[in-house]
Regions:
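C-terminal binding/interaction regions
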Residues: 121
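Channel- or pocket-lining gating/hinge segments that regulate access to a cavity or pore
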Residues: 126-129
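Feature captures the catalytic cores and cofactor-binding loops of soluble hydro-lyases/lyases
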Residues: 1-117, 131-173
């Protein structure tokens, strides 16, 4: 996946509120966006994303969801949608009456990574990274170079039958 970040921050509440900024972000963000939701550390105890939010994201042609919290309805998401969801946890619990959306499209922090709105979110089966807009072209060129070199290195390893030969020629494994 590759797309610009749309950020959402949620915090603890006793109010019975829907995640309004998150719903607005899904409906109003440009197609190709990656919805990034984070917030209070206890967000991992509830599902901030599920089947209906996935349906909205698919309808609006978003790229993926990255959640520093929980997801639910995984069987439905996998069965009915070709939509990547990267989540910290899987849990059936709802956010209603526990969390509310505090902000949208403001810088957020996940672990030690700050994600700014518009930063490129890049992911695959191995995980997700955030590429700041200011260095996106440089990072893309470097990634393409590494990918090309590793393809050549893999060919050499297979042809020679030796990891050592691949390391000697390319300097890394």
């Amino acid at each position: 996946i590759v797309g610009p970040a749309v950020t959402i921050y949620e915090d603890v509440t006793d109010e019975k509120l829907p995640p309004q900024h998150a719903l607005d972000a899904i409906d109003e963000s440009a197609s190709g966006s990656v919805i990034v939701i984070t917030g209070n550390p206890s967000l991992e105890t509830v599902a901030v994303w599920g089947g209906l939010m996935t349906a909205g994201a698919v309808a609006n042609k978003h790229e993926a969801a990255v959640l520093n919290g929980g997801v639910r309805d995984l069987a439905e998401i996998r069965r009915d949608y070709d939509f990547p969801v990267y989540a910290k946890t899987v849990t059936p619990g709802t956010t209603l009456g526990r969390f509310k959306t505090i902000s949208a499209n403001q810088p957020v922090t996940i672990g030690d990574v700050t994600v700014n709105p518009g930063d490129l979110i890049v992911g695959d089966i191995d995980g997700v990274v955030c590429v700041p807009q200011a260095v996106a072209a440089e990072v893309l060129a470097l990634a393409q170079s590494i990918d090309s070199r590793e393809l050549e290195q893999a060919k050499l390893i297979i042809q020679s039958g030796s990891l050592r030969e691949g390391l000697a020629k390319y300097g890394r494994i």
